Amino acid sequence: MXNVRKSHPLIKIINHSFIDLPTPSNISAWWNFGSLLGVCLVIQIITGLFLAMHYTADTTTAFSSVAHICRDVNYGWLIRYAHANGASMFFIFLYFHIGRGLYYGSYTFMETWNVGVILLFAVMATAFMGYVLPWGQMSFWGATVITNLLSAIPYIGPTLVEWIWGGFSVDKATLTRFFAFHFVLPFIITAMVMIHLLFLHETGSNNPSGLNSNSDXIPFHPYYTIKDILGLLFMLLSLTMLILFSPDLLGDPDNYTPANPLNTPPHIKPEWYFLFAYAILRSIPNKLGGVLALVFSILILMLFPVLHMSKQRSMTFRPISQCLLWILTANLVILTWIGGQPVEYPFITIGQLASISYFCIILILMPTTGFMENKLLKW
């Protein structure tokens, strides 16, 4: 009798993806984040579904419906904070996952990488729209500021903004459509994750050495299933601690004030995971220039395969490039800090310098260093 795991049309796909998948024998804990992101997505969809059962997408009742979830629904506070902090965990893992890809040259899998960048955009859009739903002060003003950026598009800009708003300002129509999109996008993301994995399994995983690992591959199960479960336990521990001890640590106190179109908060800022891009946006005095810099700061990831000049794939044996990548990481931390600061001296100047160095490191210094390292190794 044939093995069902290997013969059943559906189970066979799962088998080739998670059980008998040939995996390099030397991949480190940096390869855990893919599975952790999958778990995060599942947590977000489940908690989001339960929140949607009690939430009302109407300007008059949205804020009080969230309060009702926290006060009156059984474990509603837990579901709400798991969803909010789950999003933060999602982005932490996303940034680690991308950082791993940059360090080990995983971006040379062009299809997988490009689908990943599109996934990043989709997750960012979903998170932004989700932040609008509680209809607090920061929800309302964040939505107003970010949607207004589209008015910088020549000729069609102002019309496009009013079309997205469904009126002449952020109002009931905006909230309703944001809820609809926020609900449907995670399912589109799930489908894209499957495409992401499909492309990855065409080539197989990269590994820390950046060398071909076809001669030394082991089955995914049980080796990496166990390793992933360890990562999962760490994730669940940290997420649980965050939810139960300081659930509002990463949130904004302004969002506990109901949205008021007549009262602008002194400092409008997005959630922490968008602050680096927000800092780049604010560092350019011109509106259109700022919007272009904002989009390009993420879109630049797609250029990495083209900018790769080194004859080695990974940075494991390239100390100068390693140093540059860590400088880039520090630069992003500085940008994140600046994004949360008021627009005044010296923060404006620091933000502008950090924005310039962000693009310079990626577009000029990294390719030059790769080329130079080839010369140093007489390649």
From Swiss-Prot:
Residues that bind heme b b566: H97, H196
Function: Component of the ubiquinol-cytochrome c reductase complex (complex III or cytochrome b-c1 complex) that is part of the mitochondrial respiratory chain. The b-c1 complex mediates electron transfer from ubiquinol to cytochrome c. Contributes to the generation of a proton gradient across the mitochondrial membrane that is then used for ATP synthesis.
Gene Ontology molecular function: any one: metal ion binding
Localisation: Mitochondrion inner membrane
Organism: Proechimys simonsi (Simon's spiny rat)
Note: Heme 1 (or BL or b562) is low-potential and absorbs at about 562 nm, and heme 2 (or BH or b566) is high-potential and absorbs at about 566 nm.
Cofactor(s) listed: heme b
Protein topology in the membrane: Multi-pass membrane protein
Keyword Ribosomal protein: no
Stored SUPFAM superfamilies: a domain/subunit of cytochrome bc1 complex (Ubiquinol-cytochrome c reductase), Transmembrane di-heme cytochromes
GO BP annotations, alphabetical order: mitochondrial electron transport, ubiquinol to cytochrome c
Cofactor binding, per record: Binds 2 heme b groups non-covalently.
One Pfam family hit: Cytochrom_B_C
Gene3D superfamilies cross-referenced by the UniProt entry: Cytochrome Bc1 Complex, Chain C (1.20.810.10)
InterPro entries per the UniProt record, alphabetical: Cyt_b/b6_C, Cyt_b/b6_C_sf, Cyt_b/b6_N, Cytb/b6-like_sf, Cytochrome_b, Cytochrome_b_C_euk/bac, Cytochrome_b_N_euk/bac, Di-haem_cyt_TM
Transmembrane segments: 33-53, 77-98, 113-133, 178-198, 226-246, 288-308, 320-340, 347-367
Name of this protein: Cytochrome b
A single Gene Ontology CC term: respiratory chain complex III
Binding site for heme b b562: H83, H182
UniProt keyword terms in alphabetical order: Electron transport, Heme, Iron, Membrane, Metal-binding, Mitochondrion, Mitochondrion inner membrane, Respiratory chain, Transmembrane, Transmembrane helix, Transport, Ubiquinone
Subunit structure comment from the entry: The cytochrome bc1 complex contains 11 subunits: 3 respiratory subunits (MT-CYB, CYC1 and UQCRFS1), 2 core proteins (UQCRC1 and UQCRC2) and 6 low-molecular weight proteins (UQCRH/QCR6, UQCRB/QCR7, UQCRQ/QCR8, UQCR10/QCR9, UQCR11/QCR10 and a cleavage product of UQCRFS1). This cytochrome bc1 complex then forms a dimer.
Protease is among the record's keywords: no
Binding residues annotated for a ubiquinone, in chain numbering: H201
